[in-house]
Regions:
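Mg2+-dependent prenyl diphosphate-binding active-site environment of isoprenoid biosynthetic enzymes
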Residues: 15-114
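N-terminal amphipathic/basic leader segments beginning at the initiator methionine
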Residues: 1-18
Length: 114
C-alpha cells in the first residue's frame, strides 16, 4: 500500500470518528480546526508501515488506531501551545487553538482529543 493510500485511510478514520460524535458545535469546530491544520501524520503512517512490514493486512481497525495516535498527538500540541505552557501564537502557519477559540475552549478541545 502506498503512502498516500495509508494517509487517506487515517483521514477517513478521523472524519468518521468526528462525524459520529455528539459534541457542542463550538467544541467540534475547535477540535476540527486543529485536526485539519495539516501536519505530516508521521505517527499514524509509521504504525501502518510497521504493520505492513510485519505482513499484517491493513484493516479499518488499524486505521482507527492510527487515527487515535494522531488525535493524541494533536491534543498534546493544543495543550502545549496554551499560555501556561509555551504560549505560542501560531502552529503550522495558523493561529493556535487558544488564540482562535480562547483558552478554555482550547483546553476542552485538547481534552476531547485524548
Amino acid at each position: 500500500m502506498k503512502k498516500q493510500e495509508k494517509l487517506a485511510l487515517v483521514e477517513s478514520a478521523l472524519e468518521n470518528f468526528y462525524g459520529d460524535q455528539q459534541f457542542a458545535s463550538s467544541l467540534r469546530e475547535s477540535v476540527l480546526y486543529s485536526i485539519h491544520a495539516g501536519g505530516k501524520r508521521i505517527r499514524p503512517f509509521l504504525l501502518l508501515e510497521v504493520l505492513e512490514a510485519l505482513q499484517v493486512a491493513i484493516k479499518p481497525a488499524h486505521a482507527q488506531v492510527a487515527a487515535a495516535l494522531e488525535m493524541i498527538h494533536t491534543g498534546s500540541l493544543i495543550h502545549d501551545d496554551l499560555p501556561a505552557m509555551d504560549d505560542d501564537d501560531y502552529r503550522r502557519g495558523r493561529l493556535t487553538n487558544h488564540k482562535k477559540f480562547g483558552e478554555a475552549m482550547a483546553i476542552l478541545a485538547g481534552d476531547a482529543l485524548f
